[in-house]
Amino acid sequence: MADLKQFAEQLVNLTVKEVNDLATILKDEYGIEPAAAAVVMQAGGGEAAEEAQTEFTVVLKEAGASKLAVVKAVKELTGLGLKEAKDLVDAAPSNVKEGVSKDEAEGLKKSLEEAGAVVELK
């Protein structure tokens, strides 16, 4: 049993190149197709099979020195009214937008940072 645990640890810690080499060996010497090896690798090491994040949340961490500029930027970017935008900025850290694409999230972050805000993408 200890040998299996040691083998599993070695398998999980393989680099991408080593996994490719292993897939080639399994295919050439044992007739196991790479798709089957990938299924085995996913079962053994879940971290390696993690999906890329597709939806992001834009989080306003703090307004910074130019709070008025940040309120204006939040108002323009979200379509909120002036009071709602001010309340969102005052409540920092707060979510400006949730479930947006990477491109949209990066655009929002850039605009808010240009206004002086500290922004994080989650």
Curated annotation (Swiss-Prot):
Full protein name: Large ribosomal subunit protein bL12
Keyword Ribonucleoprotein: yes
Transmembrane segments: none
Biological processes per GO annotation: translation
Gene Ontology cellular component terms for the protein in this record: cytosolic large ribosomal subunit
Cross-referenced PANTHER family: 39S RIBOSOMAL PROTEIN L12 (PTHR45987), LARGE RIBOSOMAL SUBUNIT PROTEIN BL12M (PTHR45987:SF4)
Subunit field text: Homodimer. Part of the ribosomal stalk of the 50S ribosomal subunit. Forms a multimeric L10(L12)X complex, where L10 forms an elongated spine to which 2 to 4 L12 dimers bind in a sequential fashion. Binds GTP-bound translation factors.
Similarity comment text for this entry: Belongs to the bacterial ribosomal protein bL12 family.
GO MF entries: mRNA binding; structural constituent of ribosome
Superkingdom per UniProt: Bacteria
Keyword match Signal: no
InterPro entries: Ribosomal_bL12 (IPR000206), Ribosomal_bL12_C (IPR013823), Ribosomal_bL12_C/ClpS-like (IPR014719), Ribosomal_bL12_oligo (IPR008932), Ribosomal_bL12_oligo_N_sf (IPR036235)
Keyword annotations: Ribonucleoprotein, Ribosomal protein
Native source species: Flavobacterium psychrophilum (strain ATCC 49511 / DSM 21280 / CIP 103535 / JIP02/86)
Function: Forms part of the ribosomal stalk which helps the ribosome interact with GTP-bound translation factors. Is thus essential for accurate translation.
